[in-house]
């Protein structure tokens, strides 16, 4: 059973609990992400720090412009908006697409347990539970601090498709590694 990112993180709990912070990186994202820089952006109170960039995307997370605290999400195609508070408006937020690269605190597991329980998700004793990380973040943003870290120099490519591999090869060459 594919658990999606949220379920996979929860399933790996026994390996990650007690480690402080850990990196989650979508396997089909090829990038020049500066992971040391991302680590330096982590605030002590954050349960997650999400690397975002200023680029075109069909979906964006919404952040408080002063703190980069996650306060919502927008589907840029349909116009659907989810906000953490009724008093917020989309025009008072910064919108940035998520890179699929994030650092989580091991304190996230207690929140994930509450999410699974509150949502009534089915848990397979062997395989675990399936849930998308974005859905979890949109629920958790009302309960714990999740911050965005805007990477101005981030270049990324979705290599989950065969036609992207040539672009990835060209990008790798341009990085002069």
Please give the residue ranges for each predicted region.
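Short phosphate-binding loop-to-helix
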Residues: 1-23, 82-85
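Short beta-strand-to-loop element that shapes/binds the nucleotide-sugar donor at the catalytic cleft/hinge
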Residues: 48-66
């Amino acid at each position: 059973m594919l658990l999606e990112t949220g379920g996979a993180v929860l399933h790996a709990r026994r390996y990650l609990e007690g480690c402080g912070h850990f990196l989650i990186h979508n396997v089909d994202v090829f990038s020049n992400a500066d992971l040391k820089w991302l680590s330096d952006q982590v605030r002590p109170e954050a349960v997650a720090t999400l690397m975002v960039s200023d680029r075109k995307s069909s979906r964006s997370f919404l952040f408080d412009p002063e703190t980069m605290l996650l306060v919502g999400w927008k589907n840029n195609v349909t116009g659907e908006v989810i906000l953490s508070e009724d008093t917020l408006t989309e025009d008072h937020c910064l919108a940035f697409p998520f890179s699929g690269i994030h650092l989580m605190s091991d304190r996230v597991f207690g929140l994930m347990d509450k999410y699974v329980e509150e949502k009534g998700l089915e848990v397979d004793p062997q395989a675990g539970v399936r849930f998308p990380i974005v859905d979890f973040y949109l629920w958790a943003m009302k309960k714990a601090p999740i911050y965005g870290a805007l990477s101005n120099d981030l270049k990324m490519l979705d290599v989950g498709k065969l036609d992207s591999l040539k672009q990835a090869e060209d990008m790798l060459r341009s990085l002069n590694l």
